[in-house]
Amino acid sequence: MLQLEKTIGDYLEYCEYQKNLSPHTLKAYRIDLSQFLQFMRGTDGELNKSNLSRYYVHLHKAYKPKSVKRKIACLKAFCGWLEYEEIIEQNPFFKLKIKYQEPRLLPRTIPIHVIQTLLSAAYDDLKAARTAYQSRSALRNTAVLELLFATGVRVSELCSLGEGDVDLVNMTVRVLGKGSKERVIQIGNTQVMQILKRYQSTHSQAISESGFFFVNRDNRRLSEQSVRFMIHKYVDRQGIALHITPHMFRHSFATLLLEEDVDIRYIQQLLGHSSIVTTQIYTHVASSKQRDILTAKHPRNKLAI
């Protein structure tokens, strides 16, 4: 019988040291595989189709389809590794059909005037700063918001940017995305570049010591939660009646580029999507925007017949 607990530990070490997965992804894998291990303790312990099917049913009773899909994907990757390492003879997912009835949810975006309000609030903080601490904090917050919107990076990617990943000479950002896939994004706006240069100049010592481009007040890597809290602070202070997350800047980045007739293949590259199918969901958002515009602005509305 497979020593499941030990092999899960070995697999997580492989993910950390050989696949170089992010701490966030590793944490999710650890939780997902621990849940599977707990379930397997109530079975005969065999890693087979029968137990996997029962586990799938078990997950559906407790989680939303999107969460089930993620947990099964983690388990598939684990079983694929077991087969590759010849710990098992055949992947138990082979010929096991799993269907997900996942509702198609369109990405939530931030209206452009709200993005302007948030950026203006950050710049206002910078102008109003009276102490060195206030200035440094406001400068970092402004740079974070500008870079989120300028590049469409995930918040995890932003917080993981290293000292050398932001090239202010060539105006590029090197991003290490999912699956350790690297992409380079150009920064085309001079105001964004100016704020990044000011931030880097002011925080150069902390950046050098931490090894990360964005740092907190303790001169350590800025956390994803800190970014969420910072955005919430501006939203709350400006009286914006929306729940805004860092990821919504990514959705807005993609959707607004589509509305400006940017080729979807370029947007796919900018977002770091391995499949264009993932990017195509933004076309539905752009289409709904188009419908609103035509309903309100089409000249036919002015014709009295």
Identify the meaning behind each predicted range.
Residues 1-305:
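Conserved catalytic core of the tyrosine transesterase superfamily
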